[in-house]
Amino acid sequence: MIKLDFLTWKNNHSSNPHVVFNGDNMDVLKKLHAMYDKQVSCIYIDPPYNNGEKYTYYSDALSHENWLKQMKTVLTELKEFLKEDGSIWISIDDGEMHYLKVLCDSVFGRKSFVATVIWQQRNTRENRKAFSNNHEYILVYSPDPELFKKRRNLLPVTEDVLARYQNPDNDPRGPWQSVTVNVQAGHAVASQFYEIVAPNGKVHTPPNGRCWIYNQDRMEQEIAKGNIWFGSDGNGVPRAKKFLKDRAPGVVPETLWLSSFVGTNKDAKTHLQALKIYNKDIFDTPKPETLIGQIIEISTNENELVMDAFLGSGTTISAAHKLNRKYIGIESEPQTCEYVMQRMEQVVAGETGGISKKVNWAGGGEVQFVI
């Protein structure tokens, strides 16, 4: 770990940032504009949710108006750092989510909205309330959503998706899955209504209100090519074969992120406790590295710049470091920065929690702390 004052860091390290600033986020951001405006590919923030709770390191109980005012100030400042194809991801819960959405529409522009991700942040039932609240939100905005769409990364194909591809007929083209060849008939033409005779003689017609996806000539061509499956007995309802070799190398991110894939608050606490640096003063609602890692993998490539202006327990920079991204973290509390410093010492040494096994993390690199 390297401790520096701002001027020394600016003169010697700012071109390749792996840095944490201890200071008020607005003060720090104003100092960084000249160096990093329109240079950041991904901003993730986990701001106070304004839910009235008193947490270990801060009180989350501003008036609604003051919270919105502070958020507007910070978001307006952060907006200037984003590349045109970059994105900002903002965690929030039900209490202020809809107000924050309207505020973000105002700051970034309604056309800059990309998605609302729903994260299953707990998988146990809360019995003390009228409803068990098991989710939070992540609002996603980009200066240019179309450019973001072109540059965003697909997620890896999961084992359960790969398991859908089989090869029951030993097709030399390899594993495949079957999909329906009938569609809603709302805009159908006459050539999409006809009989299909299966190899073993059974006649098939489209279900009521539906039509075949191809006209008869095209369907006969697909059958001749072996692209239509009639079941193991040759009489089943026709379905198209889609081969694993032809599918995209990944999957488009969805807006529902289940805990089984990206973890929970409890998983994050378990990870932090395993580091043995937080004692009893554990962070109340930390985010898991698997969640932040997925955000970073979708929105950035290696050596691109990630920013977090509400650094907290340091999960964003820990994930970014393991994924070989540059990063800027800002945290106002000196004690919290001490915790983050100890955490990053373990990351550099090759700690094995969080996303380490997934990305084959073995340690390395350095982190600068500017105080």
Question: Residue locations for each model-derived region?
Answer:
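A glycine-rich phosphate-binding loop feature that marks nucleotide/adenosyl-phosphate handling sites
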Residues: 236-240, 312, 360-368
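Conserved S-adenosyl-L-methionine
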Residues: 64-68, 97, 285-358
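Short glycine/serine/threonine-biased micro-segments
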Residues: 21, 84, 310-312, 363
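Class I S-adenosyl-L-methionine
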Residues: 1-305, 337
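S-adenosyl-L-methionine
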Residues: 10-31, 345-371
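Extracellular structured ligand-interaction cores
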Residues: 136-138, 193, 324-327, 366
